[in-house]
Design a protein with these regions (language model features):
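Membrane-interface "cap" regions at the ends of multi-pass membrane proteins
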Residues: 12-88, 224, 248-263, 280-290, ...
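Juxtamembrane transmembrane-helix boundary signature
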Residues: 27, 94-127, 135-151, 316, ...
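Hydrophobic, membrane-embedded alpha-helices of multi-pass small-molecule transporters
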Residues: 54-73, 224-228, 241-314, 335-357, ...
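Transmembrane alpha-helical segments of multi-pass small-molecule transport proteins
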Residues: 63, 136, 164-197, 211-222, ...
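Membrane-water interface regions at transmembrane-helix termini and the short interhelical loops
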Residues: 80-83, 109-110, 126, 134, ...
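Membrane-interface loop-to-helix entry segments
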Residues: 187-238, 292-298, 403-416
């Protein structure tokens, strides 16, 4: 779901990280928070040189292997529980994933190829070092949460093997059993220790095991179809609407529809494409058109895999109900075992593991800014402890679809600012990278655009939320009738949030730059002193 850097693509950056760890900062020991973060990324502030660029095969392989995670078992199952129709799934996910691919190809990749800088330095130039520090810290927390969700998925595989019942996250179970917690702690500890030992070997292992995972999803779904009564291809659409995606939400689930599917597929990785997180990897691309390689990940991982896991979920529930089980528990391990046997169990275990490891690695790097005297392995281990705690909370999986949506909406504005700075500001006669040019510690237009856009969109969603944010219903008392009656689906907030963010940022930037007088001289290639 959330991709990690591919092995071999970031050799220069990782070599630099090792040098930073063993030798310290290049210009003496950094003391301030900003200097520590700058030192961590010091060797990545220069644009990528031509000899480091990669071709189509690298990016096709990367997206194909890194967007099938253990959480695909969860998200496909949640769509079944939220009562979408077959049309919603097939058409909605197709449109949402197409929008995601176009966002990578037309927004993220062109800027990455033009600037050849990491997202850290892009945000540093636009928003100033203080907001960049905040971005890194909050991103680390979110990455720990996502890694914890992936550990939970792997834990269901181990628990199934040893006969321990997993919490029913689709029913909203909050408290797991003590044996399940013990297994989650054990699985999380193994993942944390392996992440501490090194990233390159783990990334290589992920690239070796990942290619067969799509076949497990596909074969499991095909094998499950007879259980649902599908005897020929002509039966599928009727069965899909009657027994899989029925259009009726299960108790305790919100009703989703076509636009929910579109929004979820688009928002799932919005921090990477519209949020510009993947400029860090596409800066190594020879051409911006390589952004279309994202289609291999989206339509394998977030289309085919979600549909297949939904089919396996429905087949498992029907089998359990036929056996007299009143409350089927469609955990990733349960549905995979029914559809693909023990190959499915292995797939669940590895799909969670191979994605949790690099996610935890990235969280450790982001946390490192606040721990100047700690070695990287200690920071990664601390992040691992947080990951393990989160893995023991089943509610994370129950709300995973909304978590990834809100996470994407929160980080997306910073990417929007980069897009506007690079392409729009020159047309408006404004200075791009103004915070860098003026050596500002914080860009107040970026702060207003970031927190203003997310705050407004979150409030519009939460004020009428049916199950989560009752305490925010009071907002309606202070709104005009039209706004008070407006009900915003969190999955439909991507475009409004982007427009609102760039509008606030652009208007505030015009005020800032016009009040400051003449345009500043162009910033040097070196990042400004803080």
């Amino acid at each position: 779901m959330i991709p990690a850097p591919a092995a071999g693509v970031f050799t220069r950056g990782r070599m630099a990280e090792d040098m930073t760890e063993s030798q310290g900062a290049p210009y003496g020991k950094p003391e301030t928070l900003v200097e520590r973060l700058d030192a961590l990324y010091e060797y990545e502030r220069e644009p990528v040189t031509a000899d480091k660029l990669h071709g189509w095969r690298t990016f096709i392989a990367m997206f194909s292997s890194e967007h099938i995670a253990g959480t695909e078992f969860v998200l496909g199952t949640l769509l079944v529980g939220h009562g979408v129709t077959a049309f919603d799934v097939f058409a909605g996910l197709a449109l949402g994933n197409l929008l995601a691919v176009l966002s990578w190809a037309l927004m993220c990749a062109p800027i990455a190829v033009k600037e050849r800088l990491t997202v850290y330095w892009q945000i540093r130039k636009v928003a100033g070092p203080y907001l960049t520090v905040l971005y890194s810290g909050l991103l680390a927390l979110i990455l720990c949460l996502l890694a914890g969700a992936m550990v939970s998925v792997s834990t269901t595989a181990v628990a199934k093997t040893v006969g321990v019942t997993s919490p029913d996250y689709t029913a909203g179970d909050r408290i797991p059993s003590v044996p399940w917690i013990a297994i989650a702690v054990g699985v999380g500890t193994v993942i944390a220790v392996l992440a501490v030992l090194g990233f390159e070997k783990l990334a290589h292992f992920a690239k070796v095991v990942a290619p067969w995972m799509p076949f497990v999803f596909l074969s499991g779904a095909i094998a499950s179809l007879p259980t649902l009564g599908v005897t020929s291809l002509s039966d599928f659409w009727q069965v899909a609407n009657e027994k899989i995606w029925t259009g009726t939400a299960k108790p305790g689930h919100l009703q989703y529809g076509f636009w929910s599917c579109v929004g979820l597929a688009w928002l799932c990785n919005i921090s990477q494409h519209m949020g510009m997180g993947d400029v860090t990897i596409f800066r190594f691309a020879k051409k911006w058109q390589m952004g279309f390689c994202s289609a291999f990940g989206m339509f394998l991982g977030h289309y085919m895999a979600w549909i297949c896991s939904g089919i396996m979920c429905a087949a498992f529930e029907q089998t359990e109900l036929a056996a007299g089980v009143l409350k089927p528990n469609p955990t990733p391990a349960n549905i995979a075992l029914l559809g693909a046997g023990y190959a499915g169990i292995v797939c669940v275990l590895l799909a969670g593991w191979t994605t949790a490891n690099p996610t935890l690695y990235r969280a450790g790097l982001a946390f490192q800014v606040a721990t100047p005297n700690w070695r990287r392995w200690v920071v990664t281990l601390v992040a691992g402890v947080l990951m393990i705690v989160i893995a023991c909370i089943p509610a994370v999986l129950h709300f995973l679809d909304r978590i990834v949506a809100l996470y994407g909406l929160f980080f997306m504005p910073l990417g929007a600012f980069i897009f506007i700075d690079v392409w729009v500001f020159p047309l408006l006669g404004l200075r791009k990278y103004y915070a860098e040019a003026r050596r500002l510690l914080i860009s107040w237009p970026a702060a207003v655009g970031w927190f203003g856009s997310f705050g407004i969109c979150f409030a519009l969603y939460a004020k009428n939320a049916q199950d989560d944010f009752y305490s925010l219903h009071w907002i309606n008392d202070y709104l005009p009738t039209r706004l008070a009656n407006y009900e915003a689906d969190v999955f439909s907030q991507a475009l409004p949030a982007w427009v609102l963010a760039v509008t606030l940022y652009t208007v505030c930037s015009i005020v800032q730059q016009k009040l400051a007088g003449p345009r500043p001289a162009a910033a040097s290639e070196e990042a400004p002193a803080s």
